[in-house]
Every structure is written in structure tokens, then in C-alpha cells.
């Protein structure tokens, strides 16, 4: 669970919680259902006050477990999570400036690709498809052969994706909303994937990737794991370096430097770009949202004021119709 974390982070998350003159030393997973009190939940909520949405996610998950146990008559008590309020939802509506977005796209297709092909393909994938990180990392070159292989991946390139002058698509079999999704493979991304595939055959440094079914196989330091796909931890250093190169490292309210560009912000940037060019309805469908309200709540989209417009004056067409009617009467 704490792979890649610093000792300081590990110590922080495993330390006992001193809350309201009581010390809570057990993690939530170690409680049995009947002994978890609302005070213990409040203590863990207090511990996660700097990452409120993390607490909300945990609380939602465990609340579902309690409800399931009650429905199946495994547990007869109350759901303790009903008695502890969650943190208010923070809807972050942000995107990259258009010029920065375009520069990143150009950078992915530049000479820099030859030196960091897999990472820049990941960056291009989020900017051209809006996929979430875990949807990108688990992609395969081809459809899995068995159900076991399918469960280990997020999706795959549909057959014929690399055929010249033909449309290509990416298939996600189990995205966040649990509905299968087929996304269009836009030409710049298609060309990068073809370029990446060729590189695997021509560059000895990455030829080991040919043994993997995944587009983005896992590597850790000097070790390679072709049977596994990459993850968010592997993107930490290259993301920071990319942000530094583009001057996108900014200081937050606590004086710490953070990345302005992340995979999540890349998804939001894609959604905003589609909304601006094709409308919110198309953007919502391209992002595989359940409805347009989700897109409006979490993405920078055209303002409602943009809907206040007049139709163009097309009297000429009306006059033509009237003239046609008069001529028709004369003929009759």
C-alpha cells in the first residue's frame, strides 16, 4: 500500500490518532463492524482533514459495506457512517490555457518523443481522449484472449486501429460508470501509437516491451515487468519534470510546489476543449458522463450567457418562398 512513499508519509498515515482526549491506534480496516463507533470515525475524519475528498471516498465505500451487510442480514446494528457528516464536496473547475495545451500536444509529437516515448504517449492520450489515468495505464494493444486477462486490463485498441485512412477506436470495457465505452482514436494519437510500436522494434532499450500485451508495461527503477501495466506512481517523476520544463510548477496556499498539469487536469482540459468546439452534449458523451449536469458541474464549459443570442436575419429566404408561391399561382 505504501510502495514508493517516503518514511515521513508512511509514519504520518500509520501513527495513532489523538482525538478528543482519546487515542485511536487501529486503522479502520481492523475494526469489526459492531465495534466501530461514530467517535472513531470522527477521529479518522480529523486525521484526513488535509485530504477531505479521500475521507469522503472511504466513508462512502464503508457505508456501502454496512448497508450491504444489513440487507443480507449479516449485521443488525446501525450504519455508524450515517451519524458523521462528510466534508463538503469541492468541485474543481480548471483547465490548461489553450496555448499551453497546444504546446504540450506539439511537444508530444516532437523529437522529445524519441527519448520518453511511453510517457509522452500517455500525455497525448489524455489530451486527445480525456481518459482517466487508470483507464490509460491498463490499455492493451489487442483484445484479451481470456476472461482473466480481461480483468487485469482497462481496455484495448480495436482491430484495424492502425489501418491508414481508416477510423480507429479504443474500447474501455469497465470504466467508472460501469458502461462499456468506445472512444474515437484521433489522428495525432493514432500516429503516436504507430510511432511507439515501431520504436519497440528499433530501440533495444525498450524492446522488452514487445513481450508485453500492454501499451504501457510496468517498470520500476532498473527492473521491468512486462506482465503488468504501469500505474500513477510511475508517472510522478516524469510529470514533475514536464511541469518544470513548461513552467507549470506553481505554489499552493501552503507554500508547496505542485504540478499545474496532471492526468486529471488533462482530462478536464480535453472536456473543456470539446465543449467549446462541439457543445456540452458532445463533451459529456466524449467524457462518458452519465449526463450533461456532471460536465457542467466539474468542467469549464461555455457560460449560460453564451446561450443568449438572436437568430440571424434570413428574410431573403422568406422573400424567395413568397416569390415562389406567387409564380406557382400564376402557373395554376
Protein language model features and the residues they cover:
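Basic/aromatic-enriched alpha-helical hairpins
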Residues: 1-50, 65-67
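Short, polar N-cap/turn motifs at the start of nucleic acid-interacting alpha helices
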Residues: 142-151, 157, 259, 278-298
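C-terminal secondary-structure termini that scaffold catalytic or DNA-interacting sites
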Residues: 152-156, 201-205, 218-222, 306-332
Amino acid at each position: 500500500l505504501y510502495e514508493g512513499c517516503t518514511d515521513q508519509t508512511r509514519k504520518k498515515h500509520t501513527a495513532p490518532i489523538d482525538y478528543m482526549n482519546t487515542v485511536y491506534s487501529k486503522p479502520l480496516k481492523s475494526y469489526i463492524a459492531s465495534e466501530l463507533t461514530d467517535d472513531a470515525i470522527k477521529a479518522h475524519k480529523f486525521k484526513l482533514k488535509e485530504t477531505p475528498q479521500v475521507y469522503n471516498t472511504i466513508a462512502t465505500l464503508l457505508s456501502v459495506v454496512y448497508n450491504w451487510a444489513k440487507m443480507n442480514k449479516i449485521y443488525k446494528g446501525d450504519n455508524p457512517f450515517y451519524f458523521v457528516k462528510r466534508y463538503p464536496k469541492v468541485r474543481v473547475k480548471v483547465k490548461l490555457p489553450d496555448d499551453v495545451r497546444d504546446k504540450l500536444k506539439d511537444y508530444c509529437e516532437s523529437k522529445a518523443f524519441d527519448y520518453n516515448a511511453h510517457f509522452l504517449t500517455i500525455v497525448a492520450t489524455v489530451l486527445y481522449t480525456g481518459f482517466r489515468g487508470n483507464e490509460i495505464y491498463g490499455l492493451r494493444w489487442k483484445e484479451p484472449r481470456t476472461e482473466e486477462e480481461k480483468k487485469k486490463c482497462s481496455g484495448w485498441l480495436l482491430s484495424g486501429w492502425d489501418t491508414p485512412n481508416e477510423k480507429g477506436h479504443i474500447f474501455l470495457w469497465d470504466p467508472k460508470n460501469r458502461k462499456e465505452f468506445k472512444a474515437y482514436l484521433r489522428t495525432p494519437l493514432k500516429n503516436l501509437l504507430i510511432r511507439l510500436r515501431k520504436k519497440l522494434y528499433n530501440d533495444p532499450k525498450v524492446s522488452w516491451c514487445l513481450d508485453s500485451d500492454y501499451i504501457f508495461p510496468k517498470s520500476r527503477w532498473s527492473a521491468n515487468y512486462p506482465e503488468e501495466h504501469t500505474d500513477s506512481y510511475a508517472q510522478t517523476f516524469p510529470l514533475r519534470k514536464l511541469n518544470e520544463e513548461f513552467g507549470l510548477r506553481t505554489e499552493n496556499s501552503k507554500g508547496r510546489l505542485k504540478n499545474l498539469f496532471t492526468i486529471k487536469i488533462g482530462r478536464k482540459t480535453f472536456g473543456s476543449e470539446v465543449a467549446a468546439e462541439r457543445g456540452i452534449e458532445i463533451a459529456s458523451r466524449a467524457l462518458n458522463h452519465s449526463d450533461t449536469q456532471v460536465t457542467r458541474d466539474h468542467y469549464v464549459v461555455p457560460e449560460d450567457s453564451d446561450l443568449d443570442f438572436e437568430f440571424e436575419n434570413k428574410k431573403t429566404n422568406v422573400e424567395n418562398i413568397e416569390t415562389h408561391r406567387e409564380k406557382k399561382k400564376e402557373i395554376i
